Every structure is written in C-alpha cells, then in structure tokens.
C-alpha cells in the first residue's frame, strides 16, 4: 500500500470445487505484506481469485514457487489476466525448441468461467508454422464458477507459440508449463494479453524473444540502441512471428495498428526462463522484465 491510510481489500476465491469464502485483508499505510494462498484455500489444487480494493491504493504481485524439501522445481511471477472475454489470446508460450536443451514434461491450460452459465470452448494453436485446432480441444465444456485444467496435446514444434480461446461465455485462461530448460527445472506461467495500443517497452540489455500475433500481413516497430540510435524493424507475419531481441536494444517502440496485435516477451539466461505478456494498461506507465531468479525478490517503492 502506497497510501497514507490503510488499504482494505476483498479477495474473491474460487477452486476446482467452486466458489470459496471471500477473505478481507487490511494493509497498513505505506507497507508491504505477503500472504500464502495455501492458507486461504488449504487442500485446493486449482485456484482463481479476484481482488477488489474497498479503500486505498495498492500494488499486487503473485509469485508461484514449487519445491519439495530442498529441491526447487521452479518459480514464476504470474501476470494478471485482462477482464473475462469470449475471445482470449495467450502469447509467448514456451515450445519444445525454446532452448537447445528443452524438455517439456507438462503443459496445461487453466480455465475459469466467472459467470452463471457453463461455457463451450474451442482452443486453437497459433505458431509461425500456422494455425490449427488440436483434436480434443475443439469442443470443451467448462462448468461455471469452477477452475478447470486441461492437458495440451499435439503441441507445435516451435520455439514459442500462442493459444486462441473462443468461448460461448466470458472466460479467463492461463497456461502452466513445466519442464527442463538447459538442465534446470522450471515452471512458466503464460497469461492472456490485450492488443497493443502503441506502447514503449524498456529493456535492460538482455536478449530474448518477442512474440507477435496478428492478422496483419506485416508489422513494424522502432528499436532504440546505444546513444539513441533508432532503426525500424519490419517483419512479415503469417498469424505469428518471433523476433530475437539483441542485448544491445534499450527500447522498443510500437505503434497502434488497424489489426489487433498481441505481444509477449520471453527471456532465457543461466538463471532460468521467464515470459510475460505485454499489457497496454501496464506498459504505458511501468514496464518490468520477467524475473528470472526466484531466490531474489526486492520490493520496489513507487
């Protein structure tokens, strides 16, 4: 909480069993508090929640870390989802060729229908090699008010790919990837994303991969390097394109486009793997790189 007064927050909770009791949290003024979600819903395996601030201005971050004893199984910050929609796109999902030594052990889509009616859902894969609907994911019935997780099958053999979710009722969706990347156990969360409206993304001299999903025949953006040197990059797109971001790039400037364009950034290093969707509401004011090292977390005051 960055306010001079205390903040009061309602946390609405759901699990695989349906609606759970709402928790009310009080955050002292100008302070940071950490809560374990396992204490909110003990014994639940699939969760979704919605935060409502009754009073005060707060910043919220969610971190998922898996370990058993002294063995770490990875960790990742989870980006917030946009409002529920009948058309959802999840970009920047790691594929089997993300790094040279990639072995994906499981990849699942987590779905939640917040309304009162069940939803019929179709999932399409989008990659640089094309768009297709995998067998078994073309007509899923998801019960309302319950969190559901479905295994992804027949995955594209690309470095990165995206998912398009078409639903009869508004939904939210995320993808959880688990596997070995460069001989390191990792988990990666990929959240849905809204189309860009012309944002600027600042980078900390670290290479990565930019995922671009659009129906436009090509997309252009401006790259800023050392001493403010600018250059324009134009990429042809067949549903999706991937651009390798050099570590010399300080900034990428996007323009609003007639066709909806969706962006995500993926980074790999000796510390691990991380991806993040680029949300317009966040990137106009603050842009943060994915956190690669789950053992280091320094809260920043604003």
Language-model region placement:
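Short tyrosine-centred short linear motifs in exposed loops/low-complexity segments
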Residues: 6, 43-46, 117, 158-159, ...
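A cross-kingdom feature marking solvent-exposed beta-strand/loop segments within repeated
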Residues: 8, 14-50, 127-162, 227-251, ...
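Short, aromatic- and glycine-rich surface loops/edge beta-strands on solvent-exposed regions
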Residues: 45-55, 160-169, 249-267
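Long, internal scaffold/assembly segments composed of regular secondary structure
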Residues: 81-151, 164
